[in-house]
Amino acid sequence: MHFIAISINHRTADVALREQVAFRDDALRIAHEDLYETKSILENVILSTCNRTEVYAVVDQIHTGRYYIQRFLARAFGFEVDDIKAMSEVKVGDEAVEHLLRVTSGLDSIVLGETQILGQIRDAFFLAQSTGTTGTIFNHLFKQAITFAKRAHNETDIADNAVSVSYAAVELAKKVFGKLKSKQAIIIGAGEMSELSLLNLLGSGITDITVVNRTIENAMKLAAKHQVKYDELSSLPNLLESADIVISSTSAQSYIITNEMIERIAENRKQDSLVLIDIAVPRDIEPGISAITNIFNYDVDDLKGLVDANLRERQLAAATISEQIPAEIHAHNEWISMLGVVPVIRALREKAMAIQAETMDSIDRKLPGLSERERKIISKHTKSIINQMLKDPIKQAKELSSDKKSNEKLELFQNIFDIEAECPHEQAKQQKESKVKEISARRIFSFE
């Protein structure tokens, strides 16, 4: 069995292409089932976000599995197989495990170290698990990847430092006020940066937000979308008298907030702090306002300095996380190597315990007068003999797991002890056959 990951992401395809190869949420369960029923696929998880569509699969043969996954993606989105090959990257074995660990921990994201992808990976795994397309390997591997990512984030705090201008703007406000939940905020502008700033303010707990814009219809549209207030730009001076935070991002060619405006409203603010954050170029807020008591004025250069410093911190944290990945891959490989040994050890134990049970039956027949206490003592000691006899063979079987010729030697081991253990590959195939029947029955029932 082999682990393969096929990824269409921000490195391999532009946004126009990525938009065409994204699964709708309501189509993902059927997509999991369709792929699982495909030849060569033994387990699968599909991840589909705005920045990546990925298929993780356990396959019986690498080349066959890769082809059928690429064909599945081509058919799902109306492309040729060669098109999918051109816009995707393929990882196999250790590289596929490394890719999953990097994706889950945010090291492969456009925004380095972001945490949203961890939740998306978890949701994708849970959906696949509930659909029935995961088995022994993915149930273990995805839990390992999720645990690793959580630990990495907690130990390095990689996501704590803002690396987007809109998020950094909110972080600056937090430096002044601490918690923002009870504060009042104004968003000037109704474009993309304004919306991102609005979302970050909402994420910080602020609910009292007013959007103002020269075109009132645009302000109304943005406010309605996120269930906040809106007002005309002419109302700005009055709004400033009670505001705590102002984030401005317009394309105006002259200052929207001037020194004169702030001086007029400062008298009515009773020394309350006001944070002005200007992310527009050219600037919306007149420089020099910071000279007024309790007025904090930041522009894009201030934000860029914070973002650059934070990015350096994230890069250092990412390097620390990357150093931990080889150990995770090694741990996974050790676990995988034991998969073939466990059924052999189980079969050996079952045979030995069957012999012990037969021996006890024989003793019961030949010595019918034994008391219950005597019988328990004999049973205990015969089991002890069995365990002592099995100790060295089991140790040898475990050591075979790391041998390059482990399959051949495990087969010899089984012949010596006259036992027969089902290999993980056969177990996976039988599991798939059973689950495919369940999926088919579920579809028939749903259709009826």
UniProtKB/Swiss-Prot annotation:
GO terms for biological process: protoporphyrinogen IX biosynthetic process. Possesses an unusual extended V-shaped dimeric structure with each monomer consisting of three distinct domains arranged along a curved 'spinal' alpha-helix. The N-terminal catalytic domain specifically recognizes the glutamate moiety of the substrate. The second domain is the NADPH-binding domain, and the third C-terminal domain is responsible for dimerization. The keyword NADP applies. NADP(+) binds at residues 189-194. Belongs to the glutamyl-tRNA reductase family. It catalyses: (S)-4-amino-5-oxopentanoate + tRNA(Glu) + NADP(+) = L-glutamyl-tRNA(Glu) + NADPH + H(+). Homodimer. InterPro entries: 4pyrrol_synth_GluRdtase, 4pyrrol_synth_GluRdtase_dimer, 4pyrrol_synth_GluRdtase_N, GluRdtase_CS, GluRdtase_dimer_dom_sf, GluRdtase_N_sf, NAD(P)-bd_dom_sf, Shikm_DH/Glu-tRNA_Rdtase. Pathway: Porphyrin-containing compound metabolism; protoporphyrin-IX biosynthesis; 5-aminolevulinate from L-glutamyl-tRNA(Glu): step 1/2. Keywords: NADP, Oxidoreductase, Porphyrin biosynthesis. PANTHER family: GLUTAMYL-TRNA REDUCTASE 1, CHLOROPLASTIC. The active site is at 50 (nucleophile). GO terms for molecular function: glutamyl-tRNA reductase activity; NADP binding. This is Glutamyl-tRNA reductase. Its EC number is 1.2.1.70. It comes from Staphylococcus aureus (strain JH9). Substrate binds at residues 49-52, 109, 114-116, 120. During catalysis, the active site Cys acts as a nucleophile attacking the alpha-carbonyl group of tRNA-bound glutamate with the formation of a thioester intermediate between enzyme and glutamate, and the concomitant release of tRNA(Glu). The thioester intermediate is finally reduced by direct hydride transfer from NADPH, to form the product GSA. Gene3D superfamilies: Glutamyl-tRNA reductase, N-terminal domain, NAD(P)-binding Rossmann-like Domain. The record marks 99 as: Important for activity. CDD domains: NAD_bind_Glutamyl_tRNA_reduct. Catalyzes the NADPH-dependent reduction of glutamyl-tRNA(Glu) to glutamate 1-semialdehyde (GSA).
